[in-house]
UniProtKB/Swiss-Prot annotation:
Provenance organism: Nitratidesulfovibrio vulgaris (strain DSM 19637 / Miyazaki F) (Desulfovibrio vulgaris)
CDD domains the record matches: lytB_ispH
Protein name: 4-hydroxy-3-methylbut-2-enyl diphosphate reductase
Lineage of producing organism: Bacteria, Pseudomonadati, Thermodesulfobacteriota, Desulfovibrionia, Desulfovibrionales
Cofactor binding comment, as recorded: Binds 1 [4Fe-4S] cluster per subunit.
Annotated binding of [4Fe-4S] cluster, by residue: 12, 96, 193
Catalytic activity, as annotated: isopentenyl diphosphate + 2 oxidized [2Fe-2S]-[ferredoxin] + H2O = (2E)-4-hydroxy-3-methylbut-2-enyl diphosphate + 2 reduced [2Fe-2S]-[ferredoxin] + 2 H(+); dimethylallyl diphosphate + 2 oxidized [2Fe-2S]-[ferredoxin] + H2O = (2E)-4-hydroxy-3-methylbut-2-enyl diphosphate + 2 reduced [2Fe-2S]-[ferredoxin] + 2 H(+)
């Protein structure tokens, strides 16, 4: 069996940076360490840090005196960050720089009187954080069809942004439709991470050359789910797994060429394990 592994598979810059900050806290501090929410969307990574004594807090009410709290890579809402600092905890901001740039860009456009239209998953922590910088009137949509159902007004000065891990092609479709619907251009913040674009494009390129695609990453990871979506859209059998034991072995044994990629929060060890198993079939 031939395996074509994506060169872009695995940790992105933002994830690597966040985990380096957390590793430094664990190594250099005697104080109790916690993250506010999962630092990244990968349960195996979270289990690794839990074994090292890192707590994952649901909210700021769980902060204890003397604790050092690391803000997740996805960022947090403004009100939550204010509440966290008010606890007196030592705060370490591990927000991805690309997410931070999106937050500040949205705040700047809001300051000019703009109303945000956000292309993203409404229940995703990054999106909740981005919306908190947008003020009243902001609307979020997960697809072009959802956007078409929103009550857009001709007398409102909209601007557009996207979750950093959103689908680039879908975003371009949104821009085109809004131009037609509103009859003019609106400010468009280029908030989709370039690493996301490259990862998705490589997944598409590989999917067109193989008989099956395996995508490795957390089921809660939006960028991993979208990798599976763009691969599946090429008409190839695609499976999204977190670990090697979830692979549909009987189905994959029928294939001679399999593509392998992984989300931005998937550790190399998990990708390697899946590749070794596939090569053994």
């Amino acid at each position: 069996m031939k395996i074509i592994r994506a060169r872009t598979a695995g940790f992105c810059m933002g994830v690597s940076l966040a985990l380096r900050k957390l590793d430094r806290e664990v190594t250099e501090n005697n104080a109790p360490i916690a993250t506010l929410g999962p630092i990244i969307h990968n349960p195996q990574v979270m289990a690794h840090y839990e074994e090292r004594g890192v707590r994952c807090l649901r909210d700021t009410a769980q902060v204890v005196p003397g604790q050092r709290v690391v803000i997740r890579a996805h960022g947090i809402p403004v009100a939550e960050e204010t509440a966290l600092k008010a606890t007196g905890a030592s705060v370490v901001d591990a927000t991805c720089p690309k997410v931070k740039r999106a937050q500040l860009g949205i705040a700047e456009e809001r300051g000019r009187g703009g109303t945000l239209l956000l292309f993203g998953e409404a229940d995703h922590p990054e999106v909740r954080g981005l919306l908190s910088y947008a003020g009243e009137g902001a609307m979020v949509f997960g697809s072009l069809d959802e956007l078409k159902g929103l009550p857009l007004r001709d007398d409102v000065a909209y601007f557009l942004a996207a979750q950093t891990t959103q689908d680039r092609a879908g975003f371009e479709d949104v821009v085109s439709w809004l131009r037609q619907r509103l009859g003019h251009d609106i400010p468009v913040l280029q908030t989709i991470c370039d690493a996301t674009r490259k990862r998705q494009q490589e997944a598409v390129d590989i999917a067109r050359r193989v008989q099956a695609m395996v995508v490795v990453g957390g089921f809660d990871s939006g960028n991993t789910r979208r990798l599976a979506d763009v691969a599946r859209a090429q008409g190839v059998f695609t499976v999204h797994v977190e670990t090697v034991d979830q692979l549909p072995v009987d189905e994959l044994r029928k294939k001679s060429v399999i593509g392998l990629t992984a989300g931005a929060s998937t550790p190399k060890s998990l990708i390697d394990a899946v590749q070794r198993f596939l090569e053994s079939l």
